[in-house]
From Swiss-Prot:
Vacuolar iron transporter involved in the transfer of iron ions from the cytosol to the vacuole for intracellular iron storage. Involved in detoxification of excess iron. The transport mechanism is not well defined and the role of protons is not clear. It comes from Plasmodium falciparum (isolate 3D7). GO terms for molecular function: iron ion transmembrane transporter activity; manganese ion transmembrane transporter activity; metal ion binding. Iron transport is insensitive to the proton pump inhibitor bafilomycin A1 or to the proton ionophore CCCP in a yeast heterologous expression system. Functions as a proton-driven antiport in a bacterial heterologous expression system. This is Vacuolar iron transporter. It is found in: Vacuole membrane; Endoplasmic reticulum membrane; Cytoplasmic vesicle membrane. CDD domains: Nodulin-21_like_3.
Amino acid sequence: MVSKKTIEARKAYYNEDVVLSKEAHDFYHNLDKHGENHNLDKDNLKTIIFGSLDGIITIFAIVSGCVGAKITPTQVIIIGIGNLFANAISMGFSEYTSSTAQRDFMLAEKKREEWEIENCPSEEKQEMIDIYMNKYKFDSEDARNLVEITFRNKNFFLEHMMSEELGLIVTNEDKNECLKKGIIMFLSFAVFGIIPLSAYVAYTVFFGYTDYTTSFLVVFISTLTTLFILGLFKSQFTNQKPITCALYMVLNGMIAGMVPFLLGVVLKNNISE
């Protein structure tokens, strides 16, 4: 999970509490020294949030459109399950391939920069001097001093240069990590995507099917409730306030659900069979 230091620091920021902010930094500074500050992998967190939100909204939209078009419950369930797994597999594979491509590009650029630092150190230093002067407005002497200090640690200089010059963050990702991201995306999409479908199945199968409007409302309420909770969870890792983040997710879900439902109703009433 996100570090306690970060949670306390954000709480202090939201409340404009300087004392709490200092306490959070001072207390957890000692924990950091002993390696006790555990941070959640930001890339995996991004994958989980994106996959879960995309899953629940995508399947919600599909079910809503089917219900609006007054498709039979059996057909809705078949269409929903088919789309759930098809989209989950597609999203997982896309995450794997994009992560692999990003990793390969990053490693290729890293090797190139390593070669240039080894064979053209003066030119590489001058590039960083120019960046410090042009981007950060350091004077010539300070820029050169910074470069000479950072160049003593070749790994730091390499990673810092890749970040400043190429906009790339050096990671230690291997192909197993890329595969892991793909699996996380698949599971996130599938687990949360099944929520609106499960609500529909529960209403139509276990409680008896009555009418299309009520079934839509059941799916609508269950989906928006889940999105609200996801929004609160997401706010723990962003700079948004919990309620603001949650309401934004609910608004997104409302639009994504209402549009296909209304389109289904209109098309059903205007297209002859």
